[in-house]
Amino acid sequence: MNQALRVSVRFFTTLREVTGKKEENLEFPKGETVTVSNVLKRLAENYGKGFTEYVYDIKTGEVKGFLQFLVNGRSISSFNGLDTKLEDGDVLAIIPPVGGG
């Protein structure tokens, strides 16, 4: 039986509104290299324009710099950024900026 690699994604504030969820569980084929970038692309496919426009700069196609990403509670900046590889059971949190002023 072919097992899947499972990753949980947690959404906060605006992304909860965009997705209508607090959490999404994604499955990828076992053996596939899964990165934060791959997960974002899958989420963009699943949630469409609202998610895509919130996460990506439409002009450059790059992920917007104001978003923070944590893998199992640690910032991806301490790993390999968007190329950080994810393992089965990892939790990716996507955290928009907290408003203030």
Regions found by a protein language model. Name each.
Residues 1-100:
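Ubiquitin-like/PB1-type beta-grasp interaction modules and other compact soluble beta-rich domains
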